Structures are given as structure tokens and as C-alpha cells.
Amino acid sequence: MPTFLNGDITTPGHLVDPDPRESFADIPEVWDYPDFLDVQLKTFHDFVQDDVPPADREDVGLQAVFNEHFPIKDNRDRYTLEFVNYELDAPKHTVEECIAQGLTYSIPLKATLRLTSKEEEGGEEAIEAIEQEVYLGTLPFMTDRGTFIVNGAERVIVSQLHRSPGAFFEKEIHSNGTELFSARVIPFRGSWMEFSTDVRDVLWAYVDRKKKVPVTTLLRALGFSSDEEIVKMFDLADAVDIGDEDEFEEHLGRELATSVTIEKTIEIVDEDTGEVVDEEMEREVLLPAEHELEEGDWEELDEYDVSRLYLVREDVEDEALDKSTLVETLQKDSSHTEEEALEVIYEKLRGSEAPDLDSAREALERLFFNEDRYDLGDVGRHRMNARLDVDVDTDEKVLTKEDVVGIVRELIRLQNGESTADDIDHLSNRRVKSVGEQLGSQFSLGLARMARTIKERMNLRDADKFTPKDLVNARTIESVINTFFGTNQLSQFMDQTNALAEMTHKRRMSALGPGGLTRERAGFEVRDVHHTHYGRLCPIETPEGPNIGLMLSLCVHSTINDFGFLETPYRVVEDGRVTDRVEYLSAEEEDQATVAQANAPIGDDGHFERDEVRCRHQGDFPIVEPEEVDYMDVAPNQIVSPSASLVPFLSHNDANRALMGSNMQRQGVPLLRSDSPIVGTGLEGRVAKDSRSCVVAEGEGVVEYVDAERLVVRYDEEQDKTDLTFGEPVQEYELTKFRRTNQGTCMNQKPIVQAGDRVEEGEVLTDGFAMEKGELALGKNVLCAFMPWHGYNYEDAIVISERLVADDVYTSVHIEEFEHEVRDTKRGEEELTREIPNVSEEATKDLDERGIVRVGAEITPGDIIVGKITPKGETDPTPEEKLLRAIFGDKAGDVKDASLKAKPGMEGGVVIDTRLFSRRELDPASKKMEEKRLENIESDHERKLADLNERFWEKFFALVEDATSAGLEDREGEVLLTEGADFEEDAFDEVDPSDLSTRAEFTEDEELNDQISTLLRNYKSRRRDIEGTTKRQKHQVEMGDELPSGVVQMAKVYVARKKKIEVGDKMAGRHGNKGVIAKIAPVEDMPFLDDGTPVDLVLNPLGVPSRMNLGQIYETLLGWAGDRLGVKYATPIFDGASLEDVGDELEKAGLPRDGKVQLYDGRTGEPFDEKTTVGQIYMMKLEHLVEDKMHARSIGPYSLITQQPLGGKAQFGGQRLGEMEVWALYAYGASNTLQEMLTFKSDDVEGRSEAYESIVKGENLPSPGVPESFNVLVRELQGLGLEVTLD
């Protein structure tokens, strides 16, 4: 039986109650969804730490980037530039202003830098420090919707899935069948180090991807100089003492693991005198490694006093492994000491001999052991420690000897079959690089460039006095950041067709982009669904086409942890009992766990009802006893994204169709009147709310005023004065009205509450675009029949009723933006006007005095939208001429029409808004108005500030009423209160709250101090908002509108068009059931029910069996029951209505249980032979509208080289007559038509103009000439050196 999902809402006075949905869910909701936009908002605010006072900022994000690059010193250590803190100012413009004027929504970034200079005066060192605030440029700031506005367009920074830093082990099979193993260390920043075995079992190390050296050479260079040390460290050999010959003979026949070397003294003798000039130690190999001990070896060993040997271990069972890789490698190693090893590596790196030992050691250390050049990051160190089972301090961000030894040890274990290679597609090896981190790396790039120029300037300025401002060039950082937002592959123009498309774009994960994969290189494995995607990345929602599997979507419950790995929540199971505790697990942690499904039956006491529970463990699905279960899924829809979660009966659809269904919901055009689906999944409200396309109540309160454009809510004020916030009790919300989205659809908010209503925190107050009663509404519920209809619905085509057109059921509003600039040209300034030369009065009737079309005017193709004249004339006018023209206003003779006109296909447009942006004017009248407006802004600012200060002191004294002072000073160090004094109001008469420090000890009570600090922080935040608003208003008055250089004025006109549904438009349901409208039939011709109701839509039943998307049938039947009963349903995926439930609802509605009824032919009135499945289906109109695709060329542009018409609608191009079309004309023997097509109608330049002339004169067409493409071919051949002439 369905239950009510939201409880019975009976609040009186609501304009429209959000109807509760009857839910079929059996599994209770135990864990709430995270905010769906956290993936953007949280990471950005963690990066900028905008709500944290400078002194309290953690060493992450922007703060960490500054700390990484500062201090900067000159070469002689005389000057040091240190970073103190950074400040973020309020944005100069609002989001709306930026969108309207084509600006970037950004905040000014300022840093306080300290320049310390050391100078020697009279033998003593004098230190001078200058601290200064320096402007570092503007930083694009994220809006509260999780987007960036760059040059007026909303953009999204997509998160990137890339390979995590750390050590990775791989295995491959050589063509001869040998198993080859390799390891790779990938840092965040710095050179890669690689290791690999070859077919002879030698282990090589690749340093900085250059030439290879035996791994033992690298180990020696790191300090493990002797063979004995190396084999002992890896426990590869038995150390055997041979004190006498008997002990030696015990080991005869065994192999040496290391070579036996001796040191000999060689005398260097002068040939002329015979004197010994010098002595040199030389190392000589007595017995090589892998040598089998023989009886004759004892004498040599005894002679040189060798008492210990390292022999290959006997306890290795497998004969193939009796020689260790390392023993083979030692054979290849030409070095024997640390010094020799360092020299070998230096030679490989630099291609020349090392000048000295220190240089050789420094070359290696700079690559992997220097913090400035190498950084594993927190993630890399965490992964290294976990994978290699080493215990290196987490603050150590460079490679260590333990790491290298750990990697070699792991490679030996791999070769011995004791360990397994890494799966590169496992989500423990892939991490998310979110917005904040991407911005951080760009910022780091900009700061590194800036640091270089600062250093250069320091070195150049010797005796000059200079300040931090003289050293810093703000444009350096700004240009890097702007390039990132403008050109980076992950900075994308936001898909804004509807609220779901917007939200999905922000939650997208891309494997492409800088440092990621490319479409061409990505194979099947990396695109495939992996078992670690469960609950983290959606297995359904991914694009079709070349990006399949590379662009993924976050699951509903998925979050990103501090290391950037994806986590998903699970309920903890203890001793077979499911607890209410929830833990987030990363893919690595989950590998150790056994996880039960969300639908496993549980008793009232939390124990599993069955003795055997089906679970997941890594990639398997074992059936285990309840005691062995560690965790349980929190929800059945945990494995999919919000988009796939909105598809009811998803479990009855084939995965390919489910993919199409979830993708096509994003293409649904917001309709004039949207309906939320009768059959939903219960997630519609949450998606609509989290998409931020509606206004949500910030607390409990009462709606004071409502109209179509604004909404005023009075929130309940806390009765006690100890409330630490400064929220305004009365909030006014300006509603978004008919705003154009990125895709040209219409964004419009309308209130769903009435004046006098009580609202609660989180309650939806307005509908956004594609919303109804606070729920997502992408389409319409229509009565549908599954049957063929006179062949019109063949192959997925759709037949619809004329009612859907006449009643505007699928009518949508689309908005186009027209922009026209007025420039200052060499010949004089252009001008907006309605007085245009050689244009009739009729053509300018809708233009106002500025030459801009009036709001409400209807636009047809060719109409003037913005009237503009531009000066013409061969010569520039002299000042006298300019004066005479200004006096007599004679413009007609020397100006030409440069008006903006409506393009073809613009029928039915209505002007809904016009804007004119102008530079600041400086005439006396304007100046006077400006001064008055500035005065008003200033007085308004002072009033708001005084009110805020009063509220602060009121709350402050309420907190410290019974407390005594711990000794209080202001920021300048001046004593305000002595220790033990009471907090008297008189003592603070002259004190401004902003002078108090958030870190001061106000009282002896720690808890009270924290409360005061919070109050002070909230005060400063509110004050910053007020000052930012004032600054913005003043800037607007003083500077006028910001326009590009050379532009004097810019006019923008917004034209709205209603698009009714028509033949050729694409429609789709939520189950991948898409089709194109082939016929709009009269209502009277449509099949009708017993009671005479005609159906709205006829779908082909053959579209169901082969596509295997039965969800549409379930939805149709349940929708019909809901329509009859006046109920809306929630059928969550994997926990929804069964066939039995659907049948029950149909019976309750008085409909046949199987949903099949007798239909009658509208044309004849005769009953059809068979009963037909009928019901209410939810269908959307997609943005692939035929009107946007229809195109016909008259005269348009030609390609310069081939002289053929261009292709495509955007270029106003022609239709290509391709190879196959030419064959068709051959086949019909239409030689004249073919010749015409290839000459006059294409690229016979002379023939074209002659044909035009003859048509005009009414003469016969001339003979065709030579097509230009033939001339191009001739020139190509001539370019190859072949002489081709045409006789």
C-alpha cells in the first residue's frame, strides 16, 4: 500500500500547497542527501576562505599557495618580501549587472606584504621593514548557484578525475610470454621516477624519464653502497660465515648472491726514475655473483681473508625464482660504491662527467629530495604510506630512502606472486581535482611567474629605496586566471536548458582536460563501469558518443573527502545488527568490507531477518551470514545520479535506454505551463530546491508582501538579545523575470505563497523555470495510446493531437538577445537615432527617440531593432566641418545606415526588454545629479552603519552583563578596560566595534570569549557587506557603465518568442523513448475512449519490445490511475511500485487491471480490432526544435578558394550535393540538371553572374563555363611541378 511521503499538509492560507505524493517505498529514509551543489560551493569557499578572518585562516587553498611562494629573497639576501595576509573586497558589480553588461563577476584581491631590507651602517647591520597592502588583481568569484560569470556568460568549472599521486605497480606480458613488472611514482609536482623489469629479470630505474640505470645503482647512490647491504636489506640471501675449510665445504655447489670483491693497493711508479709516486686503491672481483662454489675457491678466499659469503637462499621452493631479480641486477651493475653510482646517474642525467661528487649528489637530490622542486602532496604521501606499508611522517612531501626501498621490495613481492598489480581504474587510484584545487594550481602558476619578476626587480634595484608596490605586477596573476577561465577545457559554457541540466553540469566529473586523458587515447577499460563506482559515480549517466565513460556524474549520496577521493555513506552493521550510525567509506576502505544491499529485510530490532544475506565484496556478490556483514547501503538509489534517480521504474529499463532517458531529461525545454509528473520518484522537490533556481525561506517567518516581481518575508527575531547573528528581520527577494539562459530558454520565477502565510526554514517560496509547486517539472502528463496509426508513427515517429498545439500544452518561450555597439570611429562618432537616411516612416514607427525598438513591439524579419547611423566620406571632417554639422544637424548626406535588423526566421518575436549602457557624461546638469546621488548613498550608508553598531553593542552588553574584564585593548594597543573591571557602556563610547580584535581575551570565561568572537566576526562580515554595497553604488555613479574601449554606447534588446510544438520537433519520455513528431492530427481524427475522450498522443508499440524499456508501460498505467484518482505518486527506483501495486491502483480508479481498453477510430467511429494500452505518460519537448534546424539559402557567402557556397545554418550556407547525389542524377540520365548543379548553382563564377544577368533580362541561359574547383585541381597539380594547361 502506498504511504504519504510528506505527511498531510494542511497549512491554511497557502496559495498552492505542494501536494503530498503517495509513496510506494518500503525502505525508510535513514540518511539525508548532501547538498547537491556542495561539490562546487564547498571546495571554492574552502579555497578562498572568504568568511574566515585573515588571522584564523588555515594553511589550505589560497593561503597555502601564498605560503608556498613566499618569502622571496634576492640573490645577495639583502631584501626579503614576506606574505602577511590577504583580504578579499566586495565585488564591484552584482551578478545581474555582470550578466547584463557582459562583465566578469569578480572580487578584488589584496595582500599585505612586508619588505625587509638589511643595510650595513658603520659595521652594524640595520634592518628596515615596510608593510604595505598591495593590489593583486581580481579573482572571478563563484555565485551562490555554483557558477562563474565571465564576460557576461555563466560558466562552470567541471571537476576532473585524474590519476592520484603516489606509487603504482603494473604487470604486462612480453611477446615471449615473460611477465614484466613496473612501478611508477607520480608526484603532484616534479619529476617521475619509474622502475621496470626486463625479460632477463634485471630491474631498472628510470630517473626523470631519461636513460635507465640498474636499480642497485640508484640504491647505492642513496647510501646503500655495498652488495651485502642491499641483499641483506631485502632478505634475499643467506649470510654464511666460513672460518675454515670444513665450513666452506658445507656450502659447495651453492650460488653466490653477491660478487666477492677485494681491495688492492696499486703503486704508481715514475717511469723515468723508478720511484713510487702515489698509491691507489682498486676494487677487484674475486668471484662473480651467480658463481657456484667449487673446491678450488677456498684457497683464493683464504688468501684474502674473506670470512663471510652471501649465498642465494635455499628456501625458495619455485625453481624459476631461485635467482632473485636483485641478484640479476647486481650482475648488470657496473658501480660498486656510492661515489661510482652517483657519477653514473649524473652522466645519464646530464650527458657528461660530474665535476665533483657534491655536484653529482646535488643533481639527484634536486630531482626527488628537494621540497622546492618535488612535492608528493598530502595525498601522495598518504597513498605511498598505504601502498608500500611504510611509516614515513605525513609532513614529509618528498621521496625518502624508505620509499625507494619499499618500491623495490614490492616489485620483488610482485615477481614472487606475493602481491598483485594495481588496477588503474580503481577509484583509490583516481582522485577528484575540484574547482578550488584547479584554481589553486593556476594561482600557483601566476605567483611563480610573479615571484620571478619580483626577484629580478630586487636584484636590479641596488641602492634605490622601494616598496612592495614597486615590486609587484598585478597583471601577471590576472592573465593566468583569465586564460584558465577563458580557454581551459574544464571551464565550460554552462548547460542551462533547465534546472536539472544546470545542476548536472555542476556535478559532472571529467577524465579529460590538462593532465588527464584524451578521447583518442582512452581505451575501453578506463571508460567501463568499475565495481568501485558503486555509490560514487553513476553507471548510467554518461554521454553517448566519443565521450562515453569519460564524462561521469556524481551519485546522489557521494561526497569528496579531504584527499580528493570519492566517498559514499554506509550504515554500520555490528554482530548482525544494523545500527543507525553512518560512515563514509572511500573505495580503498570499502575493499576490506562486506556490504549488504539496502533492500535486505531487517526486523524491528535491527537484525537481518534471514540467515543468509546477499552482499558485495570488491567485485563479487557473496551470500554470507549476518555476522560477517560490515556495512549496509543507506538507500536503494545510492548507486545512481540525481538525473537517473528521477526516472521512475528505472529497474524495468535496459541500461542503454535508461542512459538515454536520464540524458534527455536535461534537454527538456521549460514550457509555458509545466506539470510535475503524476508518476515521480520523490526526488523532484529536492532536485528543484538544490538547483537554486527557486527562492527558499531562510528561517521561520511570515510573508508580508507578494507580487509577480518581489516577495517580502519578515523572519522571526530571537527574543533574547544574545542571538549572535545580524540577519535582517525583513528580507526582500527580487524575483527573476523572463531572463535569457545560456541556451536561449526562459528563466522566470513566480511566487507560490500568499501574503500572511507562515513559512518554515527551507520552504520553497517561488517556482523557478521548469518547476511546479516546488517540484521539477520538465514536461507534461498526456493521455497516450500504444498503437499504430495509419503508418504515421512508423520507426519511433509520434502522432499528436491538435489539442496540444491549440491549448499551448507544449508551447515554450525562447528569448534572443541582440546587441549593437556605438563606436567612436576615425570619421566621427556613430549615433543611435530613429532618423535614418532612405528609410520610410513605416520602418521606424516602433523606434523610440534613441533609435531603440519599443518594448511590446512585434518583430518580423528585416525590421529595424536598433537604428544607428555611421559617418561615411573619403576624408576625415575638419574641425570647421564638424562645427557646422553640429549647428545645422545636416547628417543625411554624409552618414550611412548601420542599423541592426532582424534575421530571417524571426517571425512572432515580441520585445520584452531594452537596455542602453553609456559612458559617464560630464555636463554640469549630469554632475549636479551625480553629486546628489552620491550624497544620498553616503547618508544611507551612515544610517545602516549606525543601526548595525547599535545592534552590536546591544548584543555585546547582553553577553557580558555579569562578566568582568580580563584586561582589554583595542587593535592599536590602547587599554580600554583594566583587568577585573566591569563592562561599563561609558568605556566604549568612543570605540568603533571594528577596532576590537576577534582574538582578544575579553573575559576569564573561555566559552563567553568564543561567543563574543563569533559575534564580532558576524558583525565584521555584515559590515563588509554594507561597505561593499556602498562602494558598488558609488562606483556605478562615478564611473558610469563599464564598456569596452572604443565603445561609446551599447544597446541590448531582448526578444521573446513563443514556439508552439510542430511537425519535426523531438519529444521524449524519461525511459529513452524518444521520437520526432510526424503528424499533428485533428482532435476529431484521434482514437477515442468509450466516453468520447480523444487521446493526445499515439506511440508505436513496436518501440517497446526491442528497446526493453518497460518502465514506460508501468508509468503509463500508474499515471492513468493517478490522473483518475487525483493523486501523484512517488515510486523510488529499486524500491517502487510492483506490477501488483499498479494493478491495485488501476482497480481503485475503476480502470481495467491490465490497462487495456477498447478504442474507437476517430475517422470512422469504428472500434479497433484489439484492445489498446492507454494511460497518462510524462513527455517532454526537447531543445532539438525543427525551427532552429530548418534553413534555406538564397544568396550567401562563398568559400574563397573553391568559390562554392559555405555549409551549415550558421554560415547561411547551401545544401551539399555530394558524391552519392551525383550518382543519383547519373542514374536518371538528368545530364542538364547535373551540369547546372555543378556549374551555375555551385562554383562557375563567370557563369553565375551571366546566368543572373540573363534571368534579369529574360534571355536564355548562357553555356556553362569551367567550375572553379577544376581550376583548384589544376593549380594543385602545378604545385606538384606538373605542367597542366587547358586548351
Curated annotation (Swiss-Prot):
GO terms for molecular function: DNA binding; DNA-directed RNA polymerase activity; ribonucleoside binding. The keyword Transferase applies. It holds the Pfam family RNA_pol_Rpb2_6. It catalyses: RNA(n) + a ribonucleoside 5'-triphosphate = RNA(n+1) + diphosphate. It comes from the Bacteria. GO terms for cellular component: DNA-directed RNA polymerase complex. Disulfide bonds: none annotated. Its EC number is 2.7.7.6. It is an enzyme of class 2 (transferase). SUPFAM superfamilies: beta and beta-prime subunits of DNA dependent RNA-polymerase. The keyword Transcription applies. GO terms for biological process: DNA-templated transcription. InterPro entries: DNA-dir_RNA_pol_bsu_ext_1_sf, DNA-dir_RNA_pol_bsu_external_1, DNA-dir_RNA_pol_su2, DNA-dir_RNAP_su2_dom, DNA-dir_RNAP_su2_hyb_sf, RNA_pol_bsu_bac, RNA_pol_bsu_CS, RNA_pol_bsu_protrusion. Keywords: DNA-directed RNA polymerase, Nucleotidyltransferase, Transcription, Transferase. The RNAP catalytic core consists of 2 alpha, 1 beta, 1 beta' and 1 omega subunit. When a sigma factor is associated with the core the holoenzyme is formed, which can initiate transcription. DNA-dependent RNA polymerase catalyzes the transcription of DNA into RNA using the four ribonucleoside triphosphates as substrates. HAMAP family: RNApol_bact_RpoB (MF_01321). Belongs to the RNA polymerase beta chain family. This is DNA-directed RNA polymerase subunit beta. It comes from Salinibacter ruber (strain DSM 13855 / M31).
